[in-house]
């Protein structure tokens, strides 16, 4: 035991009437919703990087947090892991996520970094034996170190490609050893700053081959989890190749990987791409590639990707409605890719941020489930497209332009516009949130 969270009680569900800030008001893990426990619907995960590795810096200032585990030794990395599992237990968090650089110190060589990762993974595995918390997904940090400034899989230097591939192999091994449900790839540096020095074709082909290697290795080692790509349009690159759901799907189709890889979709990244979160989720579900989500929010005034904890449950309810429509999570879940503000220095702030985020998502899920169970929205949606269920409409889809023209002329088809009833449906939605 450490003393970092000393005095903070285990968070329990007390209901909406509770005034205890260290209690859940909406998140009741055992509450059954649509035939499934709330915990199994939401599958919450704590992000190792924002919660335990981020020093509190921003583009205009450095570290504000003073954590006892900050440093570059394995002993401090193990202390960080011990503190992390204490918070997981306080929250009752079912999952966590990590990058390799979050959990192990950087070595002077690749071999040393590999040994460090293996040792800390053994330590984390020991901690997991005494905890209910499991690994939702692991990933490799291929963007922070200066070697990745021009990308990893898309780097013009073959040696960086090699280093990156070897790093991913080690992280996949670590993820499998810890029983991870997924493995994530995020291409923060897989993009460009200027076309003046960029070969788009080569970079795309190298990225495609890299991903094929990842999929091949997954099957070789017998990893039963899902490979996930996380889209983002920019930050840190000016233009990233995994821009949004549609772009990534085109990339997967190009390299024959659309049946092998799904997506980890982040709320903040969807906003950066000019979409709503629910749009990206609905499109991914339509394409059969919805895997998992990162839950956070941006600053809507500045437009920055601020990775704040969610607190707007009506907005989140739209997202969870699309997840319910898609059948819910299988291997995926709700990872809080969110960080407390750099002025929030106290251990209590870190715990309460997760309490608020978990309650917000639980409240959103309950609202989405009520509407989904009611069925009114789906009835209205089906009625709008009912004409396509007729034999004539189905036959038209199997015919030709010439045949359709002949039918329009013969039957004097002259369609009249029909209301989309948007305001009615918005009012319906508001009744449930």
Curated annotation (Swiss-Prot):
Subunit details: Homotetramer.
Gene3D superfamilies membership: Divalent-metal-dependent TIM barrel enzymes
Keywords: Carbohydrate metabolism, Cytoplasm, Isomerase, Magnesium, Metal-binding, Xylose metabolism
Keyword Isomerase: yes
Cofactor descriptive note: Binds 2 magnesium ions per subunit.
GO terms under biological process: D-xylose metabolic process
InterPro entries listed in its UniProt record: Xyl_isomerase-like_sf, Xylose_isom_bac, Xylose_isomerase
Residues annotated as binding Mg(2+): 305, 307
GO cellular component: cytoplasm
Catalysis performed (reactions): alpha-D-xylose = alpha-D-xylulofuranose
NCBIfam families per the UniProt record, alphabetical: PRK05474.1, xylose_isom_A
Subcellular location: Cytoplasm
Enzyme Commission numbers on file: 5.3.1.5
Enzyme class: isomerase
Gene that produces this protein: xylA
Family to which the UniProt record says this protein belongs: Belongs to the xylose isomerase family.
Protein name (database record): Xylose isomerase
Cofactor requirements of the protein: Mg(2+)
Source superkingdom: Bacteria
Chief location: cytoplasm
GO terms assigned for molecular function: magnesium ion binding; xylose isomerase activity
């Amino acid at each position: 035991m450490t003393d970092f969270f000393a005095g903070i009680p285990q968070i329990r569900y007390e209901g909406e009437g509770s005034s205890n800030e260290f209690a859940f008001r909406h998140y009741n893990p055992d509450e059954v919703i649509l035939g499934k426990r709330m915990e199994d619907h939401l599958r919450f995960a704590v992000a190792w990087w924002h919660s335990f590795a981020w020093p509190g810096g921003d583009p205009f200032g450095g570290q504000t947090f003073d954590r006892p585990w900050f440093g570059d030794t394995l002993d401090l990395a193990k202390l960080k892991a011990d503190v992390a599992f204490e918070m997981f237990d306080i929250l009752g968090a079912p999952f966590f996520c990590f990058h390799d650089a979050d959990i192990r110190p950087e070595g002077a060589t690749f071999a040393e970094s590999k040994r460090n990762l293996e040792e800390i993974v053994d330590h984390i595995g020991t901690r997991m034996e005494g905890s209910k918390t499991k690994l939702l997904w692991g990933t490799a940090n291929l963007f922070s170190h200066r070697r990745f400034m021009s990308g990893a899989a898309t780097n013009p230097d073959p040696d960086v490609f090699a280093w990156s591939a070897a790093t991913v192999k080690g992280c996949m091994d670590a993820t499998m050893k810890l029983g991870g449900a997924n493995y994530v790839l995020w291409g923060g540096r897989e993009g460009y700053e200027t076309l003046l020095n960029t070969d788009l074709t080569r970079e795309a082909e190298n990225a495609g081959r890299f991903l094929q290697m990842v999929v091949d290795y997954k099957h070789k080692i017998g990893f039963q989890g899902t490979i996930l790509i996380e889209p983002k349009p920019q930050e840190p690159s000016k233009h990233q190749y995994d821009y949004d759901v549609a772009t990534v799907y085109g990339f997967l189709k190009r390299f024959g990987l659309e049946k092998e890889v799904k997506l980890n979709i982040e709320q903040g990244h969807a906003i950066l791409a000019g979409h709503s979160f629910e749009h990206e989720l609905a499109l991914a579900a339509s394409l059969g590639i919805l895997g998992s989500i990162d839950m956070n929010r941006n600053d809507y005034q500045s437009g920055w990707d601020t990775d704040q904890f969610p607190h707007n449950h009506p907005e989140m309810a739209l997202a969870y409605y699309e997840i319910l429509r898609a059948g819910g999570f299988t291997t995926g879940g709700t990872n809080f890719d969110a960080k407390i503000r750099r002025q929030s220095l106290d251990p209590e702030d870190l715990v309460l941020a997760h309490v608020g985020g978990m309650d917000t998502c639980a409240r959103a899920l309950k609202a989405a489930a009520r509407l989904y169970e009611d069925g009114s929205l789906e009835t209205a949606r089906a009625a709008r497209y009912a004409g396509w269920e007729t034999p004539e409409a189905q036959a038209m889809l199997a015919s030709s332009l010439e045949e359709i023209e002949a039918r329009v002329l013969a039957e004097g088809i002259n369609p009249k516009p029909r209301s989309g009833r948007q305001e009615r449906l918005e009012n319906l939605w508001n009744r449930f949130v």
